[in-house]
A protein has these predicted regions:
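Short, Lys/Arg-enriched N-terminal segments with co-localized hydrophobic residues
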Residues: 1-9
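Extreme N-terminal leader/targeting segments of oxidoreductases
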Residues: 14-92, 110-118, 618-660
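Glycine-rich Rossmann-fold phosphate-binding loop(s) that bind the pyrophosphate
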Residues: 96-99
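Glycine-rich FAD pyrophosphate-binding loop
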Residues: 109-136
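Conserved FAD-binding subdomain of flavin-dependent enzymes
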Residues: 140-180
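Rossmann-like flavin
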Residues: 166-274, 286-287
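Helical element adjacent to the flavin cofactor pocket in flavoenzyme catalytic cores
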Residues: 270-353, 358-359, 371-372, 377-386
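C-terminal segments that line or cap access tunnels to active or ligand-binding sites in enzymes
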Residues: 273-288, 351-353, 358-585, 589-603
């Protein structure tokens, strides 16, 4: 009986196994059929797409949803657009008079061909220029809150200034003057950094990055934008980068700090990849003859005044009120403002175009003088651009999120000071460091000199003198700034933000190498220093994500655009004159439908030659073939070299020192 039961059990098990096997076979067959059907369907789809494909460039330059298209090359650059349809019935209201606002007015006149009397610039202060300042204050002295570093591929900036007449030389443009000046007197530094009270740090054009540091930078370079939303630089780099000379160059030149946006850091790499080699000695940079107010702003003001543009000062715009229609349109209907302190409104139609500078890096600037520190409550003085943007943003999500940028002044501030002296002892020490006479009118430091061992991380620079047209011949104006304003100094035992101009001078003279016993008298009697604390100077570097900055022309807007450093435009980088002018060009071209391309951001990031060059330079002359690459990449070196041998690729790799 037992054997019979066992045979039956085994038979049942075999039947089960056969059943499972049969089911598996059926399933496998079905899967194979489904897979085959999918492949056949995919083949048909590809065949259909290919059969419908036609090579053409029609539509290549059609406007995008914002009413613009991007272009490159001389054909578009030298062409003048036709007069936009209906422009004679339109008016423009421009809020602010900084570089972006004035550029918008210039583009309205030149390319939009709008009559000057129909363009209204509304400025809260009694002086134009915004952050591009440069002034002599009789009660304080010369004041420059900052300087402007420029390069040859600021495509929109130079497109504008080729048309702005010089106010010094009849018959030439601002660009002509600038071009000739920088050809005759090219910029470069002979001492990038000092240590031990004025000794050359001998950075010697090296980045001093480890292999791991280079790989961290390359990884960031290739990371998608969306993977960097709300991330800081500390999230993507470690001490392999932060302890390098590269990082000293980077944070002192661009004012990046460890807690700033990793996304913006990546964009900077990509935007200026063609200038990596010029980073250590500033040979990539170009500067104006005078301060940016006299060199850039005043010629624009003159151009606009001649065209009949209306400037209305002491007019603080507090809000723009929108109507939203059922079909998704957003129409600016009212400008709310205060004129000389009295509240008033400006009624708008769809034919009234409104351009608003949202946010400002110099809003709430606190001024000191030689005997007073720049102390005050920045929160109280946030009533201008920031509150205007907040009021606008409260009406629609597409208008951005200003609080992402202006809510933490401990992370967005730094302080600068303008130092003026004619003392020979100080000037001799300057000349010893920068190896140039500051009084020749030519390049002096060629960019900032950073004091590597300064607790404040103090840097200073002297541009061509005089920086002001009215400056005395024996006077030298020095610009000093520090990134770490809340730590005590090396000579002055207090934070920079608590220091008077005299005390800041003492700290600077100490790092300059002036004998310690001479510092007090020189700082008190031989120098005039004006400090300026800027609570939001690096607000645009704060970590962000898509939507935090509004598009230049937000979706649905028919008569409204944003301008400046807190408006979103693809691929370009903030804290540049180019960014302000680019947003202005896009705003005017988009709202007026100007039939001409906006020059695209220079495409060096897509140029294999620049990528090869920059890789070798970042590694201080080494080839990537000389280092251990991760994993299987290392094993691919020889096969790849064999594959390209005798080809134009091998020639290219040799020309750019990949094959050495």
């Amino acid at each position: 009986m037992f054997h019979c039961e066992r045979r039956n059990t085994m038979a049942n098990k075999n039947h089960v196994k056969l059943g499972v096997a049969a089911a598996a076979a059926v399933a496998a067959g079905a899967t194979a059929i489904v897979s085959k059907n999918k492949k056949e369907a995919r083949k048909k789809e590809v065949a259909k797409r290919v059969s419908n494909f036609r090579n053409t460039e029609r539509g290549r330059f059609e406007r995008n949803s914002k009413g613009i298209y991007y272009s490159n090359g001389n054909y578009e650059a030298f062409a003048r657009p036709l007069k936009p349809e209906g422009v004679d019935e339109k008016s423009a209201y421009i809020v602010g008079s900084g570089l972006g606002a004035l550029a918008a007015a210039c583009f309205l006149v030149r390319d939009g061909q709008m009559k000057g009397e129909r363009i209204h610039v509304l400025e809260a202060m009694d002086l134009p220029g915004g952050a591009c300042d440069g002034i002599f204050d009789p009660s304080r002295g010369y004041i420059m809150r900052g300087g402007r570093e420029m390069e040859n591929h600021f495509e929109c900036l130079w497109d504008l200034f080729r048309s702005i007449p010089s106010i010094e030389t009849p018959g030439v443009s601002v660009l002509d003057e600038y071009y000739w000046l920088n050809k005759k007197d090219p910029n470069y530094s002979l001492c990038r950094a000092t240590v031990k009270q004025g000794e050359d740090a001998h950075t010697d054009g090296k980045f001093n990055l480890s292999q791991k540091g280079c790989m961290e930078i390359m990884k960031l370079f290739m990371t998608k934008d969306e993977d960097l939303y709300d991330k800081t630089i500390e999230d993507v780099f470690d001490d392999e980068v932060f302890d390098s000379t590269f990082w000293l160059y980077w944070l002192t030149m661009f004012a990046f700090e460890n807690w700033h946006s990793a996304l913006e850091m990546k964009l900077y790499f990509q935007r200026f990849i063609h200038h990596i080699g010029g980073l250590p000695d500033f040979s990539a940079l170009k500067f104006t003859k005078y301060n940016q107010y006299e060199s850039l702003i005043l010629p624009m003001i003159k151009y606009l005044e001649v065209a009949g543009v209306q400037f209305q000062y002491k007019t603080q715009v507090t809000n723009v009120i929108f109507e939203k229609t059922e079909d998704g349109k957003k129409i600016a209907r009212t400008i709310e403002c205060k004129v000389d302190g009295e509240e008033t409104t400006i009624a708008l139609t769809e034919k009234d175009l409104v351009f608003v500078t949202n946010g400002s890096c110099t809003e709430g600037t606190i001024y000191g003088d030689h005997t007073h520190a720049p102390t005050g409550d920045a929160e109280v003085r946030r009533s201008g651009c920031w509150s205007l943007w907040k009021n606008i943003a409260a009406q629609d999500a597409s208008f951005g999120h200003p609080e992402k940028f202006c809510s933490d002044i401990d992370k967005t501030n730094w302080e600068s000071a303008t130092v003026t002296t004619s003392n020979q002892q100080i000037i001799d020490q300057i000349q010893k460091i920068c190896k140039r006479d500051p009084r020749t009118g030519n390049v002096v430091t060629g960019g900032i000199v950073s004091c590597m061992d300064s607790k404040w991380l103090l840097s200073w620079t002297i541009n061509r003198q005089g920086q002001f047209k009215e400056q005395k011949k024996d006077e030298v104006c020095i610009w000093v700034y520090s990134l770490f304003t809340d730590v005590e100094g090396d000579y002055v035992k207090k934070p920079m933000k608590e220091c008077t101009g005299e005390e800041i001078t003492q700290e600077w003279l100490y790092h300059l190498g002036i004998p310690v016993e001479d510092i007090p008298a020189l700082a008190k009697d031989e120098v005039v220093t004006v400090p300026t604390m800027m609570p939001y100077i690096t607000a645009f570097f704060m970590p962000r994500r898509k939507g935090d900055r509004p598009d230049v022309i937000p979706d649905g807007c028919v008569n409204f655009a944003f301008l400046g450093q807190f408006a979103e435009t693809p691929r370009d980088t903030i804290f540049t004159t180019e960014y302000s002018v680019r947003t202005a060009m896009e705003a005017v071209y988009g709202l007026l439908k100007v039939d001409r391309g906006v020059p695209e951001v220079w495409g060096s990031v897509y140029d294999i030659r620049e990528l090869l060059d920059s890789t070798v330079k970042l590694m201080d002359g080494k080839s990537p073939l000389d280092i251990e690459l991760p994993g299987p990449l290392n094993a691919l070196k020889l096969p790849l070299l064999k594959a390209v041998k005798g080809t134009v690729i091998e020639k290219l790799l040799k020309e750019h020192q990949i094959i050495q």
